From Swiss-Prot:
<dbReference type="GO" id="GO:0051500">
    <property type="term" value="F:D-tyrosyl-tRNA(Tyr) deacylase activity"/>
</dbReference>
<keyword id="KW-0963">Cytoplasm</keyword>
<dbReference type="Pfam" id="PF02580">
    <property type="entry name" value="Tyr_Deacylase"/>
</dbReference>
<comment type="subunit">
    <text>Homodimer.</text>
</comment>
<keyword id="KW-0820">tRNA-binding</keyword>
<dbReference type="InterPro" id="IPR023509">
    <property type="entry name" value="DTD-like_sf"/>
</dbReference>
<dbReference type="InterPro" id="IPR003732">
    <property type="entry name" value="Daa-tRNA_deacyls_DTD"/>
</dbReference>
<keyword id="KW-0694">RNA-binding</keyword>
<dbReference type="GO" id="GO:0019478">
    <property type="term" value="P:D-amino acid catabolic process"/>
</dbReference>
<dbReference type="GO" id="GO:0000049">
    <property type="term" value="F:tRNA binding"/>
</dbReference>
<keyword id="KW-0378">Hydrolase</keyword>
<protein>
    <recommendedName>
        <fullName>D-aminoacyl-tRNA deacylase</fullName>
        <ecNumber>3.1.1.96</ecNumber>
    </recommendedName>
</protein>
<dbReference type="GO" id="GO:0043908">
    <property type="term" value="F:Ser(Gly)-tRNA(Ala) hydrolase activity"/>
</dbReference>
<dbReference type="GO" id="GO:0106026">
    <property type="term" value="F:Gly-tRNA(Ala) deacylase activity"/>
</dbReference>
<comment type="similarity">
    <text>Belongs to the DTD family.</text>
</comment>
<dbReference type="GO" id="GO:0005737">
    <property type="term" value="C:cytoplasm"/>
</dbReference>
<comment type="function">
    <text>An aminoacyl-tRNA editing enzyme that deacylates mischarged D-aminoacyl-tRNAs. Also deacylates mischarged glycyl-tRNA(Ala), protecting cells against glycine mischarging by AlaRS. Acts via tRNA-based rather than protein-based catalysis; rejects L-amino acids rather than detecting D-amino acids in the active site. By recycling D-aminoacyl-tRNA to D-amino acids and free tRNA molecules, this enzyme counteracts the toxicity associated with the formation of D-aminoacyl-tRNA entities in vivo and helps enforce protein L-homochirality.</text>
</comment>
Length: 159
């Protein structure tokens, strides 16, 4: 699975002008399932997202994770947005190819799994809508933007 993690002071996602997910300070996660991914990669990625120490302590050092935030009030939210274009292949020509992304049914299944597990592990999880045309608004804090990838084990054939 591929993700782009952004520390935000606020973020929201809209569909047809309506807010469908919104958080205060926390993390915006753009998420893409790749061919060959399974719940194993999803779970590993979620663990990394929750434990990554990218929030500042009193001394200004990145020492706190999303798990360290209570998720109440305006701090500690996780906004998860599906984005299959993270699997773009731009190696040939000028038009990106998306054959490395999971098929839509598998992508939805893994996205839903990720969100369900996130909701079990963290008190404030909001989402966009899988497959929808969305507008994402965010105020990047820092900025802190980190690409993440949990690849399937070597030898696992793409589906």
């Amino acid at each position: 699975m591929i993700a782009v993690l952004q520390r935000v002071s606020e973020a929201r996602v809209l569909i047809e002008g309506q807010i469908v997910g919104e958080i205060g300070a926390g993390l915006l996660l753009l998420l893409c399932a790749e061919r060959g991914d399974s719940e194993t990669e999803s779970d590993k990625l979620l663990s990394k997202v929750l434990k990554l120490r990218i929030f500042s302590d009193a001394a200004g050092k990145m020492n706190h994770s999303l798990q360290d935030m209570d998720g109440r009030g305006t701090a500690g939210g996780l906004l998860v947005v599906s984005q299959f274009t993270l699997a773009a292949d731009v190696s040939g020509g000028n038009r990106p190819g998306f054959t490395l992304a999971a098929a839509p049914a598998q992508g939805r299944r893994l996205y839903d799994h990720f969100v369900a597990q996130a909701r079990r592990a963290h008190p404030v999880v909001r989402t966009g809508q899988f497959g929808a045309d969305m507008q994402v608004h965010l105020v990047n804090d820092g900025p802190v933007t980190i690409p993440l990838r949990m690849a399937p084990p070597a030898g696992v054939a793409p589906e």
